[in-house]
Regions:
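Carbohydrate-active catalytic/glycan-binding domains of CAZyme proteins
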Residues: 1-302
Length: 302
């Protein structure tokens, strides 16, 4: 199976002047790529656009921090869906060592407003620790499905699942956490974190997530599930994107966002890489649709 290859132009977003850009969420609309991301120097969520997924326009802030709320001294780690004529954003608000998930809306996809004063998801269980963060939301047959990370504020520990009929009032799964680290896998022996999930016709629900070898070393991994909640199978090819020694992502590869490009027959994946305190956005591709062929071969005894 073809491997994921880092683009030679990396990083594709972020610089000393722009500052740290991280935890991206990429979608495609009207033939263009839309990247929602966290802009650390601005303590805000921002958006940028591209025709090829490599060269990006000047970012625009979509939602700023709101210290007056008591839970949004800093905001980041968002995802945005367009449903009908409304852009819907779920994002992470942080204050006093805690993280929460908030909600905002927009009619133009740039200027978002908060219809609510309170977060839509908070930490309630011991395993959720101090934080719920990194929302990834899909809308299927009238149901909003959210995968989120929970645990410590600096880096979360597990992944969980919730559902909603309106995107605001959420019911957490009774089997949470739905995805945890397996200590025998060195690449995730410390914890797992921020993910993106998509539904496919041929592989079920596919998840790309962060596996932490330790609190400072992270890499990108993948898994699949028939229902997005249970029977997760982690790829024997993990990790699929690793730090490159001596490079801009030498210490960690975080929070993937990925999509299938039917026209070019390839997977496209964006992530934020770190070297020391700098975090910028990188781009990788994989030719061909196959992601889990090696798993299928093993299960068939081949």
């Amino acid at each position: 199976m073809n491997k994921f290859i880092k683009h030679p132009a990396n990083p594709v977003l972020g610089s000393k002047e722009l500052g740290t850009c991280f935890d991206v969420y990429v979608t495609r609309e009207n033939g263009r790529y839309r990247m929602d991301f966290s802009w650390r120097p601005k303590k805000a969520c921002a958006v940028t656009f591209s025709d090829d997924g490599i060269h990006w326009e000047e970012p625009q802030i979509t939602l700023a921090a709101n210290p007056q709320s008591g839970w949004e001294d800093d905001i980041n780690r968002n995802c945005v869906l367009k449903i009908g004529d409304i852009y819907k954003m779920w994002y992470t608000g942080q204050a006093r060592g805690f993280s929460y998930i908030g909600y905002a809306e927009s009619y133009d996809g740039i200027n978002f407003y908060r219809p609510l004063k309170e977060p839509v998801l908070i930490s309630e269980r011991a395993w959720e620790g101090f934080s719920v963060m990194n929302p990834c939301v899909l809308y299927e047959n009238g149901i909003y499905k959210m995968w989120y990370a929970a645990g410590e504020t600096y880096e979360p520990n597990v992944l969980a699942y919730a559902e909603s009929t309106d995107g605001i009032n959420w019911t957490k799964s009774k089997i949470n956490p739905i995805f945890v680290a397996e200590k025998e896998n060195i690449y995730e022996q410390d914890r797992v974190g921020g993910c993106q999930v998509i539904k496919t016709d041929d592989m079920g629900y596919v998840m790309f997530y962060i596996g932490y070898e330790n609190i400072d070393k992270a890499q990108i991994c993948m898994a699949c599930s028939p229902d997005g909640k249970t029977q997760w199978k982690k790829s024997p090819l993990n990790p699929i994107v690793e730090p490159t020694e001596g490079s801009w992502d030498a210490e960690a590869c975080y929070k993937p966002s990925f999509m299938w490009n039917e026209e070019e027959n390839k997977w496209m994946l964006w992530y934020n890489g770190r070297s020391k305190t700098d975090e910028f956005v990188g781009f990788v591709t994989k030719e061909g649709r196959e992601l889990f062929d090696d798993m299928i071969s093993r299960s068939n005894g081949m």
